[in-house]
């Protein structure tokens, strides 16, 4: 860490029990709300190392390649274990992606956090651990097989169930809101927007 500033961020962890944290100007202060960035990012990155350790096999670091673990699970697990669901960190971006039908472009942090919350609520948080403890006949961690064994459903079915749930939630929430024309009359300004090319 090259600065004592604790309100700017980024970092990543790798399966070799290393984490890298660097600083850069960005919007961390907006989504952190009451938390300090350094505390948040250290906990998040250390959670990745815990995940890598839990899913490690005789293939060591190469096991990550063969596990088939989706990014949403890796990032969602770190979010689930170290953060709380809050407006600027997850909810606003999540809602926007759902209402625009763009869940396939969702950041794996938000996507995964939501899916891990759903997984824990539906199956119990012990299924998260059971998924990571699974090893196939070659003694390798296989996410899809471990997920199916722990939950009883495929990852594909889980994703579809999750999609239905979040769509139902956000569209139900939206349907309770007034539209702008119910609030009052809409007026247009007497000029048109034009772009000036220099």
Predicted regions and their residues:
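Flexible glycine/proline-enriched surface loops and loop-helix/loop-strand junctions
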Residues: 33, 59-64, 99-101, 112-114
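Alpha-helical scaffolds flanking conserved acidic
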Residues: 36-38, 68-77
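Beta-rich catalytic cores
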Residues: 37, 193-194
């Amino acid at each position: 860490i090259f600065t004592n500033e604790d309100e700017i961020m980024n970092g990543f962890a790798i399966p070799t029990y290393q984490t890298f944290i660097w600083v850069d100007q960005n919007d961390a202060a907006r989504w952190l709300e009451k938390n300090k960035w350094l505390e948040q990012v250290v906990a998040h990155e250390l959670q990745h190392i815990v995940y890598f350790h839990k899913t490690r096999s005789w293939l060591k670091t190469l096991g990550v390649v063969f596990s088939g673990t989706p990014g949403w699970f890796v990032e969602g697990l770190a979010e689930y274990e170290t953060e709380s669901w809050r407006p600027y960190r997850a909810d606003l971006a999540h809602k926007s992606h759902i209402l625009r039908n763009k869940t396939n472009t969702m950041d794996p942090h938000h996507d995964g956090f939501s899916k891990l919350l759903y997984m824990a609520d539906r199956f119990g948080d012990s299924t998260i651990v059971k998924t990571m403890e699974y090893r196939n006949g070659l003694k390798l961690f296989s996410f899809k097989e471990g997920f199916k064994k722990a939950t009883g459903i495929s990852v594909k079915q889980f994703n579809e169930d999750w999609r239905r749930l979040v769509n139902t939630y956000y569209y139900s929430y939206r349907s309770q809101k007034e539209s702008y024309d119910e609030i009052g009359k809409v007026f247009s300004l007497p000029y048109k927007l034009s772009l000036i090319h220099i």
